């Protein structure tokens, strides 16, 4: 396989890390932000073009958020495991290990997606019942969920393919594929809903079709690349050792994300008791604040991948330098995004809801949570640093304790004593701060740069 680095790929093993981190991270952030915007377009279209059914249609799409989030986040975590395993193998210059991991990831994504699709048809109705979806919304929500779950093979395939591209330092190809499929998604939404007069079924079909296109585009690119991650149909099989390694790193990260989603469902249940205005305000604010999270999380993903390759290459000092620069550059990017969002908060909130009361309450959420993203940056970068070394269980358990444990306990014991929106919001900086301290302690205890110092090669970062 070819070893030259193309313009859209990043050489993580040599040269300046300072210049390369943002080249990796910013397309990842743009991809996540585009996904948010395309999802918002789904809601906007059913909310404006489904006539008398628009209220239940919007509610049906929203009601499925927690379920879809749990499933997709679980597998995105596993895809991160594939990213690390492939990056390690690339750093070791072990093309055979890369080949086994790549083909294992592709097959696992399709088979895992098929299993979820089939199981989902059986448990979709009970899951929606657990969430207490209103009777008038239930049939629409069930229809949307069943169609969406049928598309899980292609949805998961895209995420695993994107992880493969990122492992070689290519974040632009997944972004381009998503942009193409996203535009197609919007066009299909308009066609199905306006022309064919469909409701949530049209939006769900459009989403699945668009994901199929993005997955197909990346698959074709992988079959034609001259890099070591090239996919060959005859080699598509699961390698037991590769799968075990992928799951050992990815499953804790996936479970962490899934439990994280569950904790947020608990918080949402508390917000739901405060009335329609609070619900609308919180929803609008979330759509604003997630943009800053996408920015900081992109540097965490960059840190994981850079550390993964350099750890595989035995360049341990470069791993530590990657973590330090990820902090610095991530802090700069996060600070800028937080300041911009806070200064334009009321205008951005008005895009989702122009009610002055909704905007006022939404601003409370933004003013409380966005400054606390300094803690989020700390634990995301440090978690990414540990995962790059293959240490995944510890950050997952500590995040579950710090984020999930505190949030669930807060809603159960603190919120009942002062049932206000601000009381609910205080749990975010408290839980994020506690988690940051826990992860920092874990890094100080593990000290990966010292633990793996014996693997250091003669090749030094110039």
Give the positions of each predicted feature.
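Short runs within selected transmembrane alpha-helices of multi-pass transporters and secretion channels
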Residues: 76-79, 148-166, 174-182, 203-218, ...
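Short alpha-helical transmembrane segments in multi-pass integral membrane proteins
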Residues: 1-25, 86-151, 195-251, 307-372, ...
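Small-residue-rich hydrophobic transmembrane alpha-helices
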Residues: 58-118, 155-174, 268, 279-345, ...
